């Protein structure tokens, strides 16, 4: 039913990943001193991967400005190419952020920035990329059941969803080998099962001082406009684990 209403764009999405990997390979690294720049956090993955929970945890830091799901980096990259590289990509990106305080830490939760992870690591000084992922069958079935307002048409098909999951998993494995100091792997299943250990590990990687408040993201009163709004208003729990018990053989076969 969903597929008849929304044509999947899976081939275009996977082709884009490949092209941006080539662009990343050809991009000259930015060797600026990271100490002169505030931290830019990019939360990446696929829809329904636990990213909203992670964003809620991080934004409990009072120095963090939560940008939400904004496609600013891709817009900046297009402008960078159109300007024939007269301006630096980081300069264009920060101008679009409209941040007046240079000490402000930002979180950008445009999930498909996973395709740009290599370019981000090279272009944005002090960039931190958090890759959120979960059990693939849980993730695939969760996106299939969801009804997104716009985009994510690949979720109309279990097979296409599996293709996209495999694509982002493969490219992130590659980028993690190349930019291991820039990318943090966050397993949603572990996060909700052992929240204290996983959250402390994340905060330590970010180089922040510990605060017990990070264990209570449901107390964060920030506005959440995604489908995860209800979930993040509740204490961390494991209710969303185990969707794979009801999945189809089609997605399972594609991931083998």
Residue ranges of each PLM-predicted region?
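Charged, solvent-exposed alpha-helical segments that act as regulatory interaction surfaces
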Residues: 2-7, 149, 208-212, 256
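Short hydrophobic/aromatic residue motifs in ordered secondary structure
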Residues: 53-54, 138, 255
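Single conserved hydrophobic/aromatic residue that forms the stacking wall/gate
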Residues: 246-256
């Amino acid at each position: 039913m969903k597929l008849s209403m929304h044509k999947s764009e899976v081939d275009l999405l996977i082709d884009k990943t490949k092209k941006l990997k080539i662009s990343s390979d050809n991009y000259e690294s930015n060797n600026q001193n990271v100490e002169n720049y505030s931290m830019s956090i990019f939360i990446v993955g696929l829809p329904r991967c636990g990213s909203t929970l992670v964003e809620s945890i991080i934004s409990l830091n009072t120095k963090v400005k939560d940008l939400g799901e904004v496609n600013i980096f891709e817009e900046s990259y297009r402008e960078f190419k159109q300007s024939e590289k007269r301006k630096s990509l980081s300069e264009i990106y920060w101008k679009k952020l409209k941040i007046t305080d240079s000490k402000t830490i930002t979180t950008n939760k445009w999930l498909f920035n996973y395709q740009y992870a290599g370019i981000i690591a090279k272009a944005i000084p002090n960039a931190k990329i958090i890759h959120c992922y979960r059990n693939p069958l849980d993730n695939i079935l969760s996106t299939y059941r969801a009804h997104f307002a716009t985009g994510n048409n690949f979720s109309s098909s279990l097979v296409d969803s599996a293709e996209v999951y495999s694509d982002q998993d493969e490219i992130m494995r590659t980028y993690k080998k190349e930019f291991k100091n820039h990318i943090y792997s966050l397993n949603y299943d572990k996060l909700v099962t052992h929240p204290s250990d996983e959250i402390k590990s994340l905060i330590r990687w970010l180089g922040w001082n510990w605060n017990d408040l990070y264990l209570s993201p449901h107390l964060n009163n920030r506005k959440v406009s995604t489908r995860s709004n209800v979930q993040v208003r509740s204490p961390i729990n494991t209710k969303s684990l185990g969707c794979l018990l009801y999945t189809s053989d089609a997605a399972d076969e594609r991931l083998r």
